[in-house]
Amino acid sequence: MASKRSAGQTIIVQPFLTLASSSPRRKALLQSLGIKFCVINPNIDESVSQFESAVAYVKRISAEKAATQTPKNTAVILAADTCVSLDGDILGKPSNARDACEMLTRLSGKVHEVHTAVTIKSETRIETLLVTTAVK
């Protein structure tokens, strides 16, 4: 947090946050924390590159979302991406209820991994963090 002095007073200036995500869950999470932010929908190609691992994929997509054009008063950009992998295959987002049922059937009783990458970008720095969880 930065501070400014004005006529003998210190004014705290909060960095303005932009959430680069179309996820309603991520938006709701920030709202529940009382954080002020704006939302942009990062219009990027989320296709998996040939031979790309799940970890490399979520880190790349998260970083690309953070690199999206943002409002001028943005000090910090927050972006994230999550994917599920099973036996080295990246499972995409189901497009309908049938796809979702097929995916759940494929995952049922098997250990699979959920990878989430979070990218935080400021004017001077960019950091991407990764969390992988094994789920059965």
Language model region names:
Residues 16-40:
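N-terminal G-site helix/loop of the GST-like fold
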Residues 23, 43, 82-84:
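Short glycine-rich, polar/acidic loop-and-turn segments at beta strand-coil junctions
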Residues 34-51, 127-131:
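Short glycine-rich, Thr/Ser-proximal phosphate-binding strand/loop in the N-terminal lobe
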Residues 5, 13-18, 31, 53-136:
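Anionic-ligand binding patches
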